[in-house]
């Protein structure tokens, strides 16, 4: 649970925001900001929360290197392309975002299928476990609606904030879990299962939001830019 909550947002939230007709620029900005911060906070939070757990060693450098390759470098490339060729970036963003979603979903499903033995541990991964994992997305999205509305944020931006709050980079969490499994002992199975189930659940939650935001967060035509 700590691993998935410590990871940043990803391209999924950006694409979902686009289809939900939310503030895409805000979504991309939040994703970029959280991604940069995660390079420091993801290994830090894992180290702090696992400090008192026996037989657990958090490989900080491995986590940082993984995030640099899978998250930071692509982010820098994307921002550079958007800065130098804004027209090209605007035309191809939706296409590459959709391809990225398909690729990430494929990786999540493939990872789950190749680690079915971890899911078979029903004593550890029972109904309560899956309920807690799947409720993370719902809790994040609900909080992402309530707090902005209390602060007077318009519905157009609230849609983006809600999706950004509930959706995480599950593929990054799964990659980290796989790379550090030898150092995590008995906790590896739970880390991987949590990340995989969250990854599948967030796609379903995102589609539900796209279908319901029109009613619960109506947007005036002049708000959409």
Locations of the language-model features?
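Alpha-helical transmembrane segments of multi-pass small-molecule/ion transporters
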Residues: 1-225
């Amino acid at each position: 649970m700590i691993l998935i909550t410590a990871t940043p947002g990803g391209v999924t939230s950006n694409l979902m925001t686009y289809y939900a007709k939310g503030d895409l620029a805000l979504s991309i900005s939040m994703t970029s900001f959280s991604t940069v911060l995660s390079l420091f906070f993801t290994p830090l939070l894992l180290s702090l929360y696992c400090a008192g757990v026996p037989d657990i060693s958090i490989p900080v450098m491995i986590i940082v290197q993984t995030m640099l390759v899978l998250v930071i470098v692509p982010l820098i490339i994307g921002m550079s392309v958007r800065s130098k060729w804004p027209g090209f970036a605007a035309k191809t963003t939706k296409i590459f975002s959709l391809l990225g979603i398909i690729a990430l979903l494929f990786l999540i499903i493939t990872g789950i299928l190749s680690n079915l033995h971890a899911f078979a541990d029903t004593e550890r991964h029972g109904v309560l476990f899956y309920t807690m994992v799947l409720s993370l997305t719902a809790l994040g999205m609900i909080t992402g609606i309530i707090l902005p509305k209390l602060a007077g944020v318009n519905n157009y931006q609230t849609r983006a904030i809600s999706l950004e709050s509930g959706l995480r980079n599950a593929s990054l969490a799964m990659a980290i879990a796989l790379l550090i499994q030898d150092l995590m002992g008995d906790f590896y199975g739970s880390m991987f299962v949590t990340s995989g189930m969250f990854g599948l659940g967030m796609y379903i939650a995102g589609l539900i939001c796209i279908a319901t935001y029109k009613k619960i967060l109506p947007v005036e035509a002049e708000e959409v830019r």
